[in-house]
Amino acid sequence: MQGRLSAWLVKHGLIHRSLGFDYQGIETLQIKPEDWHSIAVILYIYGYNYLRSQCAYDVAPGGLLASVYHLTRIEYGVDQPEEVCIKVFSPRKNPRIPSVFWVWKGVDFQERESFDMLGISYDNHPRLKRILMPESWIGWPLRKDYIAPNFYEIQDAH
């Protein structure tokens, strides 16, 4: 079943794939990495002015990595704002997705966390560097094929 936003994107010739609706009835769409930045700008202009959250996950061992964006269309006088979930999949070997920092500034730390934990590189992000792990850390701890080291250096917190 095609949702309202999917129908609007089709009407305007914007390439995407409908993934249906989640358990709360929120429309979920898949966007290709190369189309993501331009569609993000279009969604912002269309009224999706609030990025509620961004996260990422490892789809399967050796498989794709996904970056997920939850957007809300906040309008004056509307009790129930329209929401959409966007999924952008990227290959594990060289995961690159355009950053939407310049569209929604609130994605800054969230994209950095996704980079730090899964190794997804967000192109044109102004400060893409590790945020949780030390700069010297090797690997991406939330990937399903990550092998944890058998030792951890405990650092003094003083």
From Swiss-Prot:
NDH shuttles electrons from NAD(P)H:plastoquinone, via FMN and iron-sulfur (Fe-S) centers, to quinones in the photosynthetic chain and possibly in a chloroplast respiratory chain. The immediate electron acceptor for the enzyme in this species is believed to be plastoquinone. Couples the redox reaction to proton translocation, and thus conserves the redox energy in a proton gradient. Keywords: Chloroplast, Membrane, NAD, NADP, Plastid, Plastoquinone, Quinone, Thylakoid, Translocase, Transport. One of its GO terms (molecular function) is NADH dehydrogenase (ubiquinone) activity. It is found in: Plastid, Chloroplast thylakoid membrane. Gene3D superfamilies: NADH:ubiquinone oxidoreductase, 30kDa subunit. It is a peripheral membrane protein. It comes from Daucus carota. This is NAD(P)H-quinone oxidoreductase subunit J, chloroplastic. SUPFAM superfamilies: Nqo5-like (SSF143243). The lineage of its organism: Eukaryota, Viridiplantae, Streptophyta, Embryophyta, Tracheophyta. InterPro entries: NADH_DH_suC, NADH_quin_OxRdtase_su_C/D-like, NADH_UbQ_OxRdtase_30kDa_su, NADH_UbQ_OxRdtase_CS. Its main location: plastid. PANTHER family: NADH DEHYDROGENASE [UBIQUINONE] IRON-SULFUR PROTEIN 3, MITOCHONDRIAL (PTHR10884:SF14), NADH DEHYDROGENASE UBIQUINONE IRON-SULFUR PROTEIN 3 (PTHR10884). GO terms for cellular component: chloroplast thylakoid membrane. It catalyses: a plastoquinone + NADH + (n+1) H(+)(in) = a plastoquinol + NAD(+) + n H(+)(out); a plastoquinone + NADPH + (n+1) H(+)(in) = a plastoquinol + NADP(+) + n H(+)(out). It is an enzyme of class 7 (translocase). NDH is composed of at least 16 different subunits, 5 of which are encoded in the nucleus. Its EC number is 7.1.1.-. Belongs to the complex I 30 kDa subunit family. It holds the Pfam family Complex1_30kDa. One of its GO terms (biological process) is photosynthesis, light reaction.
